[in-house]
């Protein structure tokens, strides 16, 4: 137990994270004092490590140089000897491993993966084949829906927008079975989920998987950008087609010499032929396309089904049963056995059934639609032309990914009329889908939390009870055009069009999920937990004046009153919205990391921006409210380069640029690690992001000092937050102090620092300070502090202070930066029993995160970034949660409600008492069911 008599200044103990003796203090378990004060190491977990998602899959890597518990057990050591060995090894070898990891050398001696592609024996007859709408973005309109082309032995996906992994996890669609991914355009709307998907596939199994990725020539730009954080092996099968854009050969390119109007054959086997037809906007003067403008029409043609062989006809033509029957069925003519004639296959075979043809059309603008009418290679598929046209093919289904503004235009309708009998499925953004949450599991959790505590979990507009009775009838938009266009329906999530067997050819609605509404969720909740309504009333009383006195007098607050910075604080001062609270990769219940700092009329800041952040904003604020939230973004801060913290950034910035187009505005300021700039610079060749970049190293305490003096920063060792990790001569300094690093010369960053200072002042903030943490190279935490304000009496009172850890092991820099914080948001990836895994992956356990807050004297600590092994709620020792709360997606913490926060935690215990721990992937399941059952029905240790 830490006592107030112990000194807080770690420099008194000669602490340095680059000394093995110092790392012994923080790595197992975390303690701010010498080993004599540290508690004994917790027992190792019996559970196998879970997939790390974006960064690693499968078992944890072997601990280099130190002995694992399993090795010690095999060596037959006694418990006492084992404890001594662990303590000794950890003080030296753990340091060596973490030092190598901080230097980025932990993978040098790790053999590189040669990712394999799926190879399967194809089945030409395909007893089952269909196309299916994967409704990503159909409720939030933040991304393009995907389309799955399914065969017995092959899978093809068209478009990989943000949220695709999360969607497939919930609906049990195995992405590991996917062979090819096709992009109809190369932009954040259609490819926002591709980086995370490639990383996840690369981590499957011992060898990892790689898929073929196809797209127009713009794909080269995306590949160049992704190289900054995705292994090259994961992208070796990316292929672009179409005219070259005169850039580096990042991806192999096919069809360079073909006329642009010709179709490019991408896949042609016994199962399917997939061709691509380029579609560019019409131009009066300019020639050539700009990056991001090229769209693609994909044509999927299945082989014909040969007619049935008729043995009676064969016998009548003088053929005896034998090998000649097989020759005829294979298409060869044979001589009759008893007649002087030649028997042709058509004489004995029934009529063949033409193979189905499916078109996927992405026509993003009316300018593209004008060109659509004049594409020569499309004439083969028009049924309105003369039936005598050679090679005419009947199109069975057309999936329109085009927006409603285009499909409703007269130009587009005239093109659609050329396919008389085709089934049209309109999969663009349709308003009716707002009433049908696509991510049902997380929507159900959010609705339950909203019922329990609407103060911390407000519901968006389309989840409110008022909208339940006014929703649009799902069949009201089914018929979209006149009868001359054939049958046209609006796409719904998981809608299928069956291609095989031929007898079932057509639309199949059997997989469409039933409608989920807030009222339905409430009925389920009240039936499951009848006393939840009384708990809701108890929570309401926490905001009453009669209960405030009780809360202030709670002995565990550590203060006689709430902090002075919260005195008479207004509700429009600041609100923390936790958009994503999971780690590694998206799951059914938690998205990856993103925190929206709402300063209301003064603007907003985003701390980290994992994949799907824009969609989460729309689920929190509604469609119009989310657009306003994006418009108000002034600054985006990224902690480190791991994909679960930044792959939603391009989509957010692109949407902001789109919303502010034509309006007077300033570019968004993006603060992040230097490696992020490499990604953004490369990506902006594809899509303008309207941003300015500032390295986190330029926003440390010493860098801000250079703004005050208007002189370049001189690197000196000091006692500030970054001093111990980057002290003169340290190994960490050698990592970052390179000729191109802003640490060497801060002069180029001064204009951007001054601009950031101006923006912070306009938002009522005194500072934004980044500080290094122990996770990976160029990993940072951040501190935000509000400016002083006057109370009712006119007295100056300090502004609040908020600190966010990013991903980190507990470290003195984290404690130092958190001193006096009003609220600390700290990662707590692992439960306390998994400290070994936390050390190996440079993350924190829940107890360690809480210790950081208590050691720094933080008023409130919010735990986040939970491992996805905990589907709904993490394993928590409730006795440590005196001034702490756990975070959920969509949780909104207003500074005016901060004093109530810890009192809510026990009510979560009631809400989730009947929930069980779910392992979301079959590969993760263990035989030790008792281990899982030990953690239910309660997720707390009383």
UniProtKB/Swiss-Prot annotation:
One of its GO terms (biological process) is tRNA 3'-end processing. It is found in: Mitochondrion. Its EC number is 3.1.26.11. It comes from the Eukaryota. The keyword tRNA processing applies. It is an enzyme of class 3 (hydrolase). Pfam families: Lactamase_B_4. One of its GO terms (cellular component) is mitochondrion. Residues 38-85 are annotated as: Disordered. Disruption phenotype: No visible phenotype due to the redundancy with TRZ3. Trz3 and trz4 double mutants are lethal. It catalyses: Endonucleolytic cleavage of RNA, removing extra 3' nucleotides from tRNA precursor, generating 3' termini of tRNAs. A 3'-hydroxy group is left at the tRNA terminus and a 5'-phosphoryl group is left at the trailer molecule. One of its GO terms (molecular function) is metal ion binding. Residues 1-50 form a transit peptide. Belongs to the RNase Z family. This is tRNAse Z TRZ4, mitochondrial. It comes from Arabidopsis thaliana.
